[in-house]
Amino acid sequence: MSIFTKIKKSLKSENLVNYNKFIKNLEFDEKNSTSTHLIIKAPNIFIANFVKRKYLNKISELYEKETGIKPKIDIVTKEISHRPLTIEEIIEPTTPSVLIPEYTFESFIVGPSNQFAYTAAKSVAENPGKNYNPLFIYGGVGLGKTHLLQAIGNYLKSSLNVLYVTSEQFMNEFTENIRMKTPERFHEKYRNCDVLLIDDVQFFAGKERTQEEFFHTFNELYNQKKQICLTADRPPKKLYDLVDRLRSRFEAGLIVDIQPPELETKIEIIRKKCELNGIYLPEEIIEYIATKLDSNIREIEGMITKINAMSKILGISEITLDFAKQALKEHIKDKKEVITLEDIIKLIAKEFNIKPSEIVSKSRNKNIVAARRCAIYLAREFTKESTPIIAKYFGLRDHSAVSHAIKSFNKKLKEDSEFRIKIEELKNKIQIKKSE
Ligand SMILES: Nc1ncnc2c1ncn2[C@@H]1O[C@H](COP(=O)(O)OP(=O)(O)OP(=O)(O)O)[C@@H](O)[C@H]1O
């Protein structure tokens, strides 16, 4: 009998009223668990939350009694394996401890905000140890750093010895091996891989012994032309508590950033997540989530899961916009509507040296058309107006004309780096106005 079956049996024998409802259908994820880190699958988010609140300590205790090991336990839902569970947890930064098969290049949506990082990661995966070494990916919370790092690992794991760890795991293992007087075991593991992927290296900050060890690991692998990829929440030059020689190693490779996704990219990501998880959401709800929530994709995923789970539990077959609004009510921060369509028009008119009225006119003058497209794009990014309202305001036929204008705009953003910089500057100006 497996240990997990024994644990379930003990929970049953303790006559827990909720055994059938909450414990019976829990499954042990053998493939992804280790002896110190257990992953348990629950049928849905509510059961998972309940088990976490009520039974986690008990399960941990029973496991320790059986094995002598105090485990770390993650309870995940079957729908989205490996996801942390409560909405609060989903919003919290969390990093997995194993390679997650779903994090691939194919499931990663590319837009102007992450194009550079994606291309660099793909290139590293296709030519490990040859093009960019190390690859350093940085960016804000929940923007896809781990996903890209793991995509490299998943791409290479069948042909090479890939090692994926968080900086914390690296540190814990190092400390543990020192404590057990087995440093050679640690060296054996880390200095003999072909690809080393370390997530969240900002946590090396201030840990001098770990940094020292990592420095040697780095050199050893680098000299053997093994690929090293790192992620952090900031660029190497801002990792202040890192020893200089390590920082300069990081800086010697390719450094790429991931920016918050543009609205279109966000919408695409939501579509993809729904598709991957077999969730159907009408377009208007997808757009609602994308415009109302910030850029943290993990948070967005949490909201999709929540809407889906609530609809199932309440037996609702068709999810309406009102239902979604209700479900997300408490999670949508009450941001004041500070940027209006008029603000955008004024700003663009000034930038393009034309009159505000010309932007909303029917003129086909090249400069005015460019200004209009830009204004439409920014209106979608920064105001809370729906696509039909924006169409009406700019004198366009209907919402599909808005989508068309945004598509052409995104194409230009992708192709023309000077243009991209100009738009970034405009976005910054709007952000400044927003925070005034
Ligand atoms: N462009 C994208 N396409 C598809 N999914 C994405 C994209 N960007 C982020 N995600 C998803 O968002 C979630 C959070 O991403 P990830 O864990 O990679 O973020 P992170 O940048 O590593 O965040 P943290 O700083 O908290 O570690 C993941 O489920 C990931 O699949």
Swiss-Prot record:
Domain I is involved in oligomerization and binding regulators, domain II is flexibile and of varying length in different bacteria, domain III forms the AAA+ region, while domain IV binds dsDNA. Keywords: ATP-binding, Cytoplasm, DNA replication, DNA-binding, Lipid-binding, Nucleotide-binding. InterPro entries: AAA+_ATPase (IPR003593), Chromosome_initiator_DnaA (IPR001957), Chromosome_initiator_DnaA-like (IPR020591), DnaA_C (IPR013159), DnaA_dom (IPR013317), DnaA_N_dom (IPR024633), DnaA_N_sf (IPR038454), P-loop_NTPase (IPR027417). GO terms for cellular component: cytoplasm; plasma membrane. GO terms for biological process: DNA replication initiation; regulation of DNA replication. The keyword ATP-binding applies. The keyword Methyltransferase does not apply. Residues 312-436 are annotated as: Domain IV, binds dsDNA. It comes from the Bacteria. One of its GO terms (molecular function) is DNA replication origin binding. It comes from Nautilia profundicola (strain ATCC BAA-1463 / DSM 18972 / AmH). The lineage of its organism: Bacteria, Pseudomonadati, Campylobacterota, Epsilonproteobacteria, Nautiliales. Belongs to the DnaA family. Residues 98-311 are annotated as: Domain III, AAA+ region. Residues 1-69 are annotated as: Domain I, interacts with DnaA modulators. Residues 69-97 are annotated as: Domain II. Plays an essential role in the initiation and regulation of chromosomal replication. ATP-DnaA binds to the origin of replication (oriC) to initiate formation of the DNA replication initiation complex once per cell cycle. Binds the DnaA box (a 9 base pair repeat at the origin) and separates the double-stranded (ds)DNA. Forms a right-handed helical filament on oriC DNA; dsDNA binds to the exterior of the filament while single-stranded (ss)DNA is stabiized in the filament's interior. Its main location: cytoplasm. This is Chromosomal replication initiator protein DnaA. It is found in: Cytoplasm. Oligomerizes as a right-handed, spiral filament on DNA at oriC. ATP binds at G142, G144, K145, T146.
